[in-house]
Amino acid sequence: MISPNLTANVEIDGKQYNTFTEPPKALAGERAKVKFPIKDMTEFLHGGEENVTMIERLMTELERDPVLNVSGDYDMPKEQLRETAVARIAALSGHWKKDTEKEALLRSQLHGIVDMGTRIRLGVHTGLFMGAIRGSGTKEQYDYWVRKGAADVKGFYGCFAMTELGHGSNVAGLETTATYIQDTDEFIINTPNTGATKWWIGGAAHSATHTACFARLLVDGKDYGVKIFVVQLRDVSSHSLMPGIALGDIGKKMGRDAIDNGWIQFTNVRIPRQNMLMKYAKVSSTGKVSQPPLAQLTYGALIGGRVTMIADSFFVSQRFITIALRYACVRRQFGTTPGQPETKIIDYPYHQRRLLPLLAFTYAMKMAADQSQIQYDQTTDLLQTIDPKDKGALGKAIVDLKELFASSAGLKAFTTWTCANIIDQCRQACGGHGYSGYNGFGQAYADWVVQCTWEGDNNVLCLSMGRGLIQSCLGHRKGKPLGSSVGYLANKGLEQATLSGRDLKDPKVLIEAWEKVANGAIQRATDKFVELTKGGLSPDQAFEELSQQRFQCAKIHTRKHLVTAFYERINASAKADVKPYLINLANLFTLWSIEEDSGLFLREGFLQPKDIDQVTELVNHYCKEVRDQVAGYTDAFGLSDWFINAPIGNYDGDVYKHYFAKVNQQNPAQNPRPPYYESTLRPFLFREDEDDDICELDEE
């Protein structure tokens, strides 16, 4: 093997230059350019010094636990990944006695940066199953299941059986039934047909002892819609199946092989009446049914999942944008000046255009994720303490929940889509080395993209959000109050707002631009809805006719939300020494977003055709500003090499050394002849064809 010290030596202007050893110097040079305190930027990102201290402590604990080390996962088969995931879940849960709820969630999220499979295999229980118990069960029911071991995952493992083979996004169309039997005070759970088989259920194949099962409530022949029932799947001592339960493994997936996704069928499975979660919908022993004032009250666990996925979009995006930008800072290709080293790819304007807006988007995601988490915590706290008989308080809670339901749907959709795009664009930006399994992009993409379809298909979520935006606008026209996120619909001044010589670098102007475009799209869609319904279409038919407009409204409103959240956070908590650099990043994100959808701003009249060139010039300007500080922006994420888990993205920039070592560590030198040489390769290379005999005869 060639010594690294002998590779790639060239002489330029009488100086020795080595492309193998130069990258660490290049990245050190980038760090020397940084003009802001990275510590202050990190504290801004994570909400203050106290949070940063907690995150750093949790990261250190994760790194020091050998069970959680993922460095060998890229070559690990499915069966081993699943077994390893259980060991890692045990390691993570070992901290729960001392962890606060916030710390436990954050510990799992941080580990999920490099191990999405374990993150979700545990999260199905802690987030979805326990979220369903907490959100839809009474206090007495929650306490009961905690005593059974649910909170500590002791003798108990929960899964979340919502999706069916024949239904996913349309929860109201689920077919599994729960029939109340008054004589025995029980429900009988049944899978009426193959299409009603519970499908994709994480934890079902191997782990789960219980499930939160979504089923149609049937009482005295009447269908009361889908409710949640806790059903035992396995005996907690022997792990054997309970009577009437059939389940299996759905097998190989595109990614997340560590998760034991399975299918479940129920045949006359009896459960006590108390196993129906009855915080909102209730069934008495006499069969009397009381319904909640809002169906979404039952689906609180889903909202919590979506809010978490917004945060996960940031956690994963920060890893891959860091890898791509560090690599861009040390990778040299081609050159424009004779006698000089090749050019760093980060210095090519087009490469800046590819990556730096995605860096800005990653920061924006963090601001929106934190805002959504606060909104979710406030709403769920209210729902936990509210008296269902207090109509006024319940009415306010329902308004808050509707707003959270809509905003989390849009943010979940567009942040998970963006994260998938960031992973793939960063892979492409790393050229051939991005295709190596050891640099993480392939596994991460395969693991991540399920986020775009589970817990709400992104397109369906956008259409649902668009419908809600039109309904908010209709309600406002009838005198109903607007939620805070759509308050701009009441701003009549937006109709006349234009750039009109104002400064496009002014955040107030940029926010107004997005509000005007969002307002215009929603008002126009609402006008069309009114026109269609007056023309004879039912509301549902009119909404279907407006599907494209609904999607567009959701897209614009969500981007406005991201823009606003970014600037609001800067104004609220950025220290003076980092604020200008954050404004540069926020302006890049906002102007790039305008450039991407410039037609909207022309249509609404905020911009004139002559203004588009100015937008493009400003995007180029901010790319240059951000480029000079790029090492600081990425270092501020605070990710060690353990969390990067990609040799071309290591902190020291020694990409070729680490990459070459990783490949050889995972693929040690062996017999140069492959194990199939004698059985397959040699017979192929030395095969005798009939044509060979004919040629020999011809020669004779």
Swiss-Prot record:
One of its GO terms (cellular component) is peroxisome. Pfam families: ACOX, ACOX_C_alpha1, Acyl-CoA_dh_M, Acyl-CoA_ox_N. It comes from the Eukaryota. This is Acyl-coenzyme A oxidase 3. One of its GO terms (biological process) is fatty acid beta-oxidation using acyl-CoA oxidase. Optimum pH is 7.4. The gene is POX3. It is an enzyme of class 1 (oxidoreductase). Keywords: FAD, Fatty acid metabolism, Flavoprotein, Lipid metabolism, Oxidoreductase, Peroxisome.
